[in-house]
């Protein structure tokens, strides 16, 4: 999977939106694309059926990412979740991805089960760069889903653990069985924080980490894709991740 945001907001906008990036992604030999809700204008959100048609014509799979938390600060389910699930269905996405948010207890999970059953859409929850994306709450959520046999799996963002002060390797040890999608990126120290870089621009830690995660989980390229020939750059990393 190639995450459209890997090309940068400005590049996507200048190209004419996410739809304009699809031939690059397909031409690079990728299996699919992660469409990002935050990169849509209001008008573009109204053209999801046409975007879905283009994705299908190019032979790509799709997943859909909404920049939203599953749980609100008071612990309730995000009231916009049905809208995001519906948009994902319109795209014929394989799954909807959100961040965890403020997960406190199992009480809202039956309502979540009902929503997912009604929509027929798979849901994956990602560790983000907030306190809610730390290992401890992600573990609690994983355990609650297991106890309740809730069909929700995890997106493992390889780099985000560093932003929240956790060990990516420890996170992999605890969460790997529940991981169904991997956001691949390396991270290096930058101005007292971190920045995402391609895995072949960093040390072997990141490819070692990838080997701790399920081999059959789709891999999403979320590190910066830059250069004069974006198709060639994308193809390089699609091939790199297929080989690992």
Where are these regions (language model features)?
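Short secondary-structure transition/capping segments
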Residues: 45-48, 75-77, 108-111, 136-138, ...
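Active-site-proximal loop/turn and secondary-structure-junction residues that shape catalytic pockets
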Residues: 6-8, 37-39, 68-70, 100-104, ...
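N-terminal pre-domain/capping segments
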Residues: 1-82, 89
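Histidine-acidic metal/acid-base catalytic patches
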Residues: 1-6, 10-29, 89-92, 135-156, ...
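Short, electropositive alpha-helical surface patch
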Residues: 51-62, 115-122, 215-216, 231-244
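Active-site acidic/histidine proton-transfer and metal-coordination neighborhood
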Residues: 54-62, 70-153
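A structural signal for alpha-helical segments
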Residues: 43-46, 104, 170
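Conserved beta-strand positions in the central sheet of alpha/beta enzyme cores
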Residues: 34, 63-64, 97, 124, ...
């Amino acid at each position: 999977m190639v995450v459209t945001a890997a090309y940068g907001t400005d590049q996507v906008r200048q190209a004419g939106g996410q739809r304009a990036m699809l031939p690059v992604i397909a031409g690079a030999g990728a299996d699919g694309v992660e469409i990002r809700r935050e990169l849509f204008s209001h008008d573009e959100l109204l053209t999801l059926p046409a975007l879905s048609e283009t994705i299908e014509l190019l032979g790509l799979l799709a997943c859909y990412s909404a920049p939203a938390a599953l749980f609100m600060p008071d612990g309730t389910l995000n009231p916009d979740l049905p809208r995001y699930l519906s948009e994902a269905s319109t795209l014929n996405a394989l799954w909807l991805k959100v961040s965890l948010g403020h997960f406190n207890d199992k009480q809202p999970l039956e309502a979540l089960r009902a929503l997912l059953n009604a929509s027929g859409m798979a849901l994956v929850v990602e560790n983000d760069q907030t306190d809610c994306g730390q290992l401890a709450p992600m573990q609690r959520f994983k355990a609650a889903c297991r106890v309740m046999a809730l069909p929700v799996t995890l997106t493992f963002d390889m780099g985000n653990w560093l932003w929240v002060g956790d060990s990516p390797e420890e996170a992999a040890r605890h969460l790997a069985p529940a991981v169904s999608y991997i956001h691949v990126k390396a991270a290096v120290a930058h101005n007292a924080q971190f920045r995402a870089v391609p895995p072949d621009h960093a040390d072997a830690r990141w490819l070692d980490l990838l080997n701790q995660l399920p081999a059959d989980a789709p891999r999403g390229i979320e590190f910066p894709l830059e250069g004069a020939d974006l198709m060639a750059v994308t193809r390089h990393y699609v091939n790199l991740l297929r080989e690992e």
